[in-house]
Structures are given as C-alpha cells and as structure tokens.
Amino acid sequence: MSHRDTLFSAPIARLGDWTFDERVAEVFPDMIQRSVPGYSNIISMIGMLAERFVQPGTQVYDLGCSLGAATLSVRRNIHHDNCKIIAIDNSPAMIERCRRHIDAYKAPTPVDVIEGDIRDIAIENASMVVLNFTLQFLEPSERQALLDKIYQGLNPGGALVLSEKFSFEDAKVGELLFNMHHDFKRANGYSELEISQKRSMLENVMLTDSVETHKARLHKAGFEHSELWFQCFNFGSLVTLKAEDAA
C-alpha cells in the first residue's frame, strides 16, 4: 500500500543530497503523482508504444525502473511470444518493492528485475528501451555514452522512450513553467516548506537538459527520428526511433 508523502513536512536541519532510500521508496507512488504532472499519462502511453514496437523474440529494457510502473505498463501490452523485460535500478529499496509489484501481477512475459547500475548493463536484441525520468540523475558527461549503448543495442525499427524534467533556453519560458510546476505541487497539497526542502536536496543530483540538448545527443548516437510526444509544464517525454534500415 502506498503511503502519503510527508517526508519534508517538518524542517530538516541538515538536508544533504537526494537519495532513493527506504523512506522515499515507501511514499514514491504518492510523491511522483503529486510532483510530476502527466506521470500517469506517460506510464499508460508507454504501454501503448510497447504494443506498437515490441517484436516477438526481443527484449525490452526499463532503465531506472523504480517501482516498476513502466515495466508493468509494457508487460500488459505485449502480445507476442518469447519476449522478456529487463528492469534495472540501483536502489535496493526500490528494487525490493519492484519485485513485489511485478510478482503481484501475473502475465506470460517474464521480467528480470536487477539491482545494478544502468551504465554497466549490456543492451542486446532490444525492440524498446525506456528511460523514464532516469537520465537526469546521471552525470551530464556520462549521458552520451549511455545513449550510444542504447542505440547499438536496439534492433532496427526499435524505439527509445526518454522522459525527463526539462530546462529551457528561453529564460522567460523556463521561469513560467517552473512556477506553474510549483503551482501544480501546491494544488496537490505540498507546502512551501516541503517544496523548498525537496528542491534543495535535488539541486545537486538532478541536472536537467533542454529538449534541444537531448535531441542533439540522440542524433549524435545515431537516431534519425526523435520528437517530443508529451509535455506538461517542464516535464515531458520524447519518442526516438532507430531507422528500420540501420546497420
């Protein structure tokens, strides 16, 4: 059962940097619904994309799977034989709960739930890869290498779904969408103290890029087609396709 997120409702003397620990994992479903506009839509649409792109005898990778929401959405929409989903996260608390969530919903498609670093995972025979609010937690200098690896491991015609919090090259637009996101969190019951303390913990850990920067990296990796398919305020998702005639 999900618990309500009250982690930052009282003043914290020494905030430190953000970690996906046991306390965060316990309230994560409530936290992400109240913090990320459009999250449920993105999760459900990832399933629809899986129905279109997952091919028989291939693998799907959920890189930074947290509690397995995207994995479950993909699995519900796979209608082929001999497919497998590989879900990876480096948080022991998240992985423990993810395994429980996956085991609670029976389906023919097997899921390997792995506690590990997504930078160390081999991507092979993939028809779809999901990076759902994950890349932003990697050091910027390490992001290109991961996208290069994903491109190499995707089969021709395969898809990468890349969801992120965005920064904006237009400062005026960035300020507006930043403020609207905070309005969204206030409307969902977060206090000014909660918003401020969480932001302070995340600012050195979650480093955002512009859509233009993401597209430039994807193009450099070899992807020929990438476009923003969902956006709400400063959160959104790109769908990126490997050409069907790619070597």
From Swiss-Prot:
Top-rank EC class of the record's enzyme: transferase
Reaction equations catalysed: prephenate + S-adenosyl-L-methionine = carboxy-S-adenosyl-L-methionine + 3-phenylpyruvate + H2O
Transmembrane stretches, start-end: none
Superkingdom of the organism of origin: Bacteria
EC number, UniProt record: 2.1.3.-
InterPro entries reported in the protein's UniProt record: CmoA, Methyltransf_25, SAM-dependent_MTases_sf
A biological-process GO annotation: tRNA wobble uridine modification
Family: Belongs to the class I-like SAM-binding methyltransferase superfamily. Cx-SAM synthase family.
HAMAP family: Cx_SAM_synthase (MF_01589)
Function: Catalyzes the conversion of S-adenosyl-L-methionine (SAM) to carboxy-S-adenosyl-L-methionine (Cx-SAM).
Protein name: Carboxy-S-adenosyl-L-methionine synthase
Native organism: Escherichia coli O127:H6 (strain E2348/69 / EPEC)
Encoding gene, per UniProt annotation: cmoA
